[in-house]
Amino acid sequence: MKYLVIAEKPSVARSISKVIGAYKHEDGYLEGGDCVVSWCLGHLAEYAAPEYYDERYKSWRFDDLPILPEEWKLLVSEDKKAHFNILRKLLRSKDFDYVVNACDAGREGEAIFRRVYGLADSKLPVKRLWISSMEDSAIQQGFDSLKDGAEYDNLFAASECRAKADWLIGMNGTRAFTKKYGRRQTIGRVQTPTLAMLTERQNKIQNFVKEPYYKVEITGNGIVAESERMAQEQDADTMQAACDGQCAVVGSIERKRKEQSAPKLYDLTTLQREANRYYGFTASQTLKIVQELYEEKLVTYPRTDSQYITEDMQQTMADLLKHYGGEADGVKQVVNNKKVTDHHAILPTLESCKRGSNSLSGDKEKVFALIVWKMQQAVQPPYIYEDVLVTVCCQDRKFTAKYKNVLQAGHTAMPVPFAEQEKSKDMAFPKKLEQGEVIPVVSAEKKQGFTSPPKAFTEDTLLSAMESAGNKEFEKDTEKKGLGTPATRAAILEKLVSSGYVERKGKQILPSAEGVTAIANIPDYLKSASMTAEWENELLRMERGETKPADFMQGIGGLLERMLADLRQIPTVQESPIYNKVSIGNCPVCGKLVCEGKLNFYCSDRDCKFALWKESKYLSGMKKTLTKKMATDLLKKGRTYAKDFYSAKKDKTFAADLVMAIENGRAQYSLEFPKTPAKK
């Protein structure tokens, strides 16, 4: 039997081809024996913008809302049409007995294949390759146990409902709020509640009023004990005067033995959080790196929400620990069949043991080392310690001293790779100290402190907040998935940054002035983290066949009706032409939005002179016009690649990187000639 295989991207297709023997390169696919392998280039087809349903939607009018497609249209982008035509021809071919969906084993991978399959109007029976590793053995095992494609109908339904909900809320909400408030406001099903979390935290920080407090600290015989906080400095002065130079007595010594189990293995969100905490990586940066490690067969499937492995993987993990070092006896700590759905936790592969990680360097080496470290740490014994609370009495006043005795370092003894190790601030308990012991003389000192505001979010803490969003509103046994999914949270953060609503300052991620203004107009139910988290749970139930797509979409429709009804009651604000423009990035001089004009790409701040001119002397000499994509790249990366610069001296075109530098608030260009083209 001859069969067709469609992977998500060329690199995965090549890995599959080597296993099943498709070595012959053709235009857009590989062939060999009884199989042909092609690929999708990621999302080949996306839902069409409103104007493709009706030309009147090219102009934004509140009265046209809501836009509710009766029949959803999928469009293939111009730069992918040629490859789609190859796929369509293959999918319609009568040479094949069936087609294998080899796209990523998850919600989005299912949608990528199904959309292409549907657009091609293919009648081929579908089988599903579902694997958690790109190792040759895993691929072969997957082909030996292909699933019926129909088993994943519910997964596809959940993916389509998610995409349609995002489209309906995004397209209608953005147009509605933009037209009503006279400035462009981007609305998103997950983006808006996330921005609301950031602005709420920022408001608490900005409105926080620090208040002084006072303590008295007494010292004697190696003991340092402190009083409770006092609001009045006079009370602290009185206590200090009463105790200074006096004797004290150890009143009580309370000991509490505690255990802290080893942390679980990495799911994607936890890996992103810790890579941000230890290395400062953004969530999208970590996702990109771990995806590359997966495609290079060094780690297992990364877009997982599980921190466990199944029982049948115990020997595999024991073999990994034997190679990398670790307590194989502790593997049972991370085994839980009930907590593994589509994919187990992220692990290094057995292939990585054979190949080694010596070829890795830089950021890739750090992320791989972090995954190995977490595997080793997860099987370690618990951290066992003793909290000791000592009460000291002086002049009828009570002071306390806190100590911590480490009884077993356990998993905490493993240092984080490539990271500066944190020094413990805990003090060990003085062994000679006994209850009733008299301290002949103590010195007393007044200490002043101030209450502190909440900390600004980092990507580490924001990802944690997104993951746990709405938990308090759910029943105890409810499956909780928070805002977004492990696979989508990084993209949500990047969209907030690129829209100008959020900015990074060091490790902190903060709402911009534009973001604070935008969220102020949005009603609470659109900002609700618990409602959005409940939608994610509905999608999970849909994957299991417990919720009907029609019921989910009816709920989304009801939300749209409520939103538009509420907005109709609000007077329309006169439009601001600047904020009705689509921004292409942030100004490198002042940080405000950069918009496209007729002749240039200009900073929206009228006091800022920064602009990128479409026609400039520098580029005109090489017969080059600055395109929107080039300008976007320059703002984001400081450089852009093009292959049609013209050399008058040689009378031919050439490829190079156009590099931007800022001098006195203006853009200056230069060319660089890398050995390999910069990423577009």
Model-derived regions: residue spans:
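Conserved short loop/turn motifs at secondary-structure junctions
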Residues: 1-2, 102-105, 182-184, 255-264, ...
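Metal- or metallocofactor-binding catalytic centers and their adjacent structured scaffolds
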Residues: 150, 233-266, 272, 530
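Amphipathic alpha-helical transducer elements in NTP-driven molecular machines
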Residues: 10-17, 34-37, 41, 77-88, ...
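Basic, low-complexity terminal or inter-domain segments flanking catalytic cores
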Residues: 2-4, 80, 91, 119, ...
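C-terminal or mid-to-C-terminal helical accessory/interaction module adjacent to the motor/catalytic core
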Residues: 72, 94, 136-220, 255-259
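Short, polar/flexible loop-turn hinges at active-site or ligand-entry regions and domain interfaces
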Residues: 72-75, 103, 123-127, 148-155, ...
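Intrinsically disordered, low-complexity regulatory segments
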Residues: 1-163, 167, 452-453
